[in-house]
């Protein structure tokens, strides 16, 4: 750990020192080149991977694991991104969970969304309270979708406050 920076604030940076002043940043862990690079006052963040949470300044209690995970986050709080480029464009969104490569990639400001699967909710820019499960599955609209549950590979939601299960390949339902 000769290249680790351990601060009195309880923060540890491995791989590079942040380019910002970190006096107000407490209990953060960054592992990887430019991980948590812009941190100033954010606390209790975990960033593992190249450019993970790199633009985060004031966001708190975020977890980013993977290259570019939560890369553009600045003030968003309590987000979890696991997978390269998951929640990449999030800046101010809160309480989002994205698992899978490029999951919720374009989401910038939505809150309380769950996205699981390769490129799930990939094009969604805003939206709240959505659950999107399945590779390349998306809600009905890229902006402002609310309370949609979409399950299945390549499935597109039918509208706000609706549940959509399965794509066009489903031919039979059994109970």
Report each predicted region and the residues it spans.
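Glycine- and small/polar-enriched repetitive beta-structure motifs of secreted/surface proteins
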Residues: 1-175
């Amino acid at each position: 750990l000769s290249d680790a920076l351990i601060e009195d604030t309880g923060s540890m940076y491995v791989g590079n020192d942040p380019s910002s002043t970190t006096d107000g940043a407490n209990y953060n862990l960054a592992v990887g080149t430019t991980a948590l690079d812009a941190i100033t006052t954010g606390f209790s963040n975990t960033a593992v991977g190249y450019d993970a949470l790199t633009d985060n300044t004031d966001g708190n209690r975020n977890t980013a694991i993977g290259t570019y995970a939560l890369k553009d986050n600045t003030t968003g709080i309590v987000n979890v991104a696991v997978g390269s480029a998951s929640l990449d464009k999030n800046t101010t969104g809160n309480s989002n969970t994205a698992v899978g490569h490029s999951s919720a990639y374009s989401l910038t400001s939505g809150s309380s969304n769950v996205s699981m699967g390769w490129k799930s909710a990939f094009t969604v820019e805003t939206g709240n309270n959505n659950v999107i499960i399945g590779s390349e599955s998306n809600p009905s609209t890229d902006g402002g979708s609310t309370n949609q549950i979409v399950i299945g590979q390549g499935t597109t939601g039918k509208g706000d406050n609706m549940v959509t299960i399965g794509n066009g390949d489903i031919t039979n339902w059994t109970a």
